[in-house]
A protein has these predicted regions:
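Polybasic/polar functional segments that serve as interface/processing modules
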Residues: 1-118
Length: 118
């Protein structure tokens, strides 16, 4: 789900597992009732199944909801297990998650701007 996200978007993950049979209305109700967030806001909501090999993303586009689904053929997402919790993550943490890494990286390697060999 390597999509270009709109500017200034909030990204939320539903920690723990979600019943992946839920569709747009069920996921939007979960966002509103369980997490007390606005599903119509400028936010991307991510949900993961029990096996951690598939995720759904819910996004309000102004004229309707967009529901995206990704199933990994090999591997699992490093999904936080805090049941009944929603967590806001940064765009960088979103990229880590989609690439199979944990959203809680201890340290990242900084890029070197200088290109001089001594």
């Amino acid at each position: 789900m390597k999509i270009k996200l709109p500017e200034n978007i909030s990204i939320y993950i539903a920690c723990g597992h979600t019943d992946m049979r839920k569709q747009i209305d069920g996921l939007a109700a979960m966002v509103s009732q369980n997490f007390e967030l606005d599903p119509f806001g400028n936010a991307l909501f991510l949900f993961c199944g029990r096996k951690k090999d598939r995720i759904k993303a819910l996004l309000w586009e102004g004229d309707g909801f967009l529901l995206m689904y990704k199933r990994l053929e090999n591997g699992k997402f490093q999904w936080p297990n805090n049941v009944e919790q929603v967590r806001e993550i940064t765009p960088q943490q979103y990229r880590w998650l989609i690439e199979g890494l944990s959203v809680d990286q201890k340290k990242s390697i900084q890029k070197l701007d200088k290109k001089v060999i001594v």
